Amino acid sequence: MEGKREERKYNHGFFSSEVNTLAAIAETLFPPFSPTCQEENQTPKTQAVRSFMEASASELPIPDEVAEKMWKRASPKCLILVRIVLLLLSTRMGTLLICGRHCLDGKWPYINRFSTTPLAKREKVLQAWFKQRIFTPIRATFVYFKVDILYNIFARVDKNGENQLWEAIEYDIDKVENVPNERPLQKGIVETLHAKDTTHLLNSLTEKGLQATEDPRENALKIKCDAVVAGSGCGGGVAAATLASAGMKVIVLEKGEYYGPTDYSPFEGPSLENLYESGGNHPSVDGQIMILAGSTVGGGSAVNWSACIRTPEHVLREWAEECKIPVFRSKEYDSAMDMVWKRLGVTEDCNMESLQNQVLRKGCRSLGLQVETVPRNSSGDHYCGSCGYGCRRGDKKGTDRTWLVDAVNNGAIILTACKAERLMLEPNRTGTSTRKMKCLGVIAKSWNQNITRKLQIEAKVTISACGTLHTPLLMYSSRLNNPNIGRNLHLHPVTMTWGYLPDSVPDLKGKSSEGGIITSLHKVLGPDNKLQAIIETPSMGPGHFIASCPWVSGLDIKQRMLKFSRTATMLTIIRDRGSGRVHTDGRISYKLEKSDRENIRAGLRQSLRVLVAAGAVEVGTYQSDGQKMRCTGVSDEELDEFLGTVSADGGPLSGVKNWTVHSSAHQMGSCRMGINEKEGAVDENGESWEAQGLYVCDASVLPSAVGFNPMITIMATAYCISKGIAARTKKSISS
């Protein structure tokens, strides 16, 4: 997974004229400058900085790399818009339509194509389109170009594993010595991508002790077990371990691949491409929220930022009393949190904090605000800023190093690169259940094209732990129709602020990309002392950072990147009351409520105050107009005036002039628990209201948003559900 790029042909369907236009857009977004364009008080004009200022995003092979990624990852509708814009800009009349007077010339043929329009005029075109309020689909298309192009130029590495731009921005990859050469799940792993053909896979399954046979008539490999778990993340890992320890033969299906510490890459680009859903770029239908979700063995726990927070008391009270799910106020649930805490080795120890956490802590203390220490499932001396790419030190204890290890040690088998496609259902004639259907297992498919047969896993118990985005899709494909499936989606919307703190700021050492990711937290309280938001710090490689930054000009974006290593970013996270939906085709729609926007605004303003109090010389938001303020010599009145302009309105497809793109790393609620089938897709035991023997064991069962990092909540809930499954299964067998 190193991601080093050799010279090769690029696989996309764009015409050469479209790629030329894409190159012109890339050059406009990240153009070449002479070093004199740099501010006088910037970094000295070393060779690295000179090369950085002279670099252009149009340099080969960047346009083809971006084109290939778009062709592979863009949704069909998005790709249509991309091609329409590129094709129009490839012609003179199309350029006139989109660019107006900026493409006109005094010489024949009087109208330039976009690629031949002078750079300064191209920049004005993009600036105008980023503010366009009427033809928002075209504006959103230019935003898509901006995100993919800018991300690519900083996330890519050459055949030597280098990026020539990193030196100027003082970015170093996380160098890990003595990477543990271990794959703790190896004895229980069947990597279907490595199978030569169906027969080879069959032999691998039987060698692992599974009852597997080939059925040519049904074009299937039939596998029998006690329990099949689709998904290996926070919920699936716990469920697999719990059921396996109860003596059940468990099969885990994971659509991602398995990586040990030596398999992980230190590079941002290949890590996001291989470990995350849609390569780390999964937008809502309106482009307002970018979703990060793990897609590997261990799921989100393999790539999250280690924060371990118990379910808040007020949330448990709401779920038990208002949602009428008593387990959340039980000793059983408290014990489950204790069990999870212990198994993950959670500790509050932190021997050295990162720059961003130092900034959060210093700013809060300067303002007299409370700042809390965030426990982590890693050791106290774990100083790693790249756990979002998988922990190469093997220190962070995700399910791939804890619960799944327990499962494998108790005989569980994990099939990787294998996606659950639909459930095996039949009419329920048992007479012991009110559920109309009975689940008999799962039909799955390997990503390996050499495996031509489907996998038919027959099980007494079937658990969907595909995650909040994919569990509804498995239900839909199986023709389950509870109205709660896919709805009640909560995303913990994240909105960011930034502050630039030069090396001269006392007592704040390090770089923004180094150190423990989340070790501190501040709660933003409203006038009534109710929680409005929390403020934490993120992990942001240079690609993620520049893709998130507002683009107002080519020079501005380069100057921002030269400050990258000392730019501290603060996250405002809210417990969203608004909700969304996972549609049958996987699209995600989502809408914030008015109170959500008010809470986001409160969090943004508080985080800016914290950054100023910590010593930032310049602060700002990630709003599209590049909203920022220099802090040196600023009075309290001037600061308040600036904070009064801070808001978080719609996304690029909305009609607002200055828009914001939020992000989400926590997805919950799309198959929620409910006291009846009108209130939820599953009951308080996690069992589907429609199919006996079908359970859900992931974040999708949570009744509403948690408001804090939900890993502990998901695992504790999964533990309660799976303990109940094991007890009921044992009872039914004995009777």
Task: Go through the PLM ranges and name each one.
Residues 1-111:
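Near-N-terminal "mature-domain entry" segment
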Residues 110, 114-143, 150-153, 297, ...:
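Rossmann-like flavin
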Residues 242-269, 290, 296, 409, ...:
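Glycine-rich loop(s) and the adjacent beta-strand/alpha-helix scaffold that form part
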Residues 2-16, 48-77, 113, 134-226, ...:
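Extreme N-terminal leader/targeting segments of oxidoreductases
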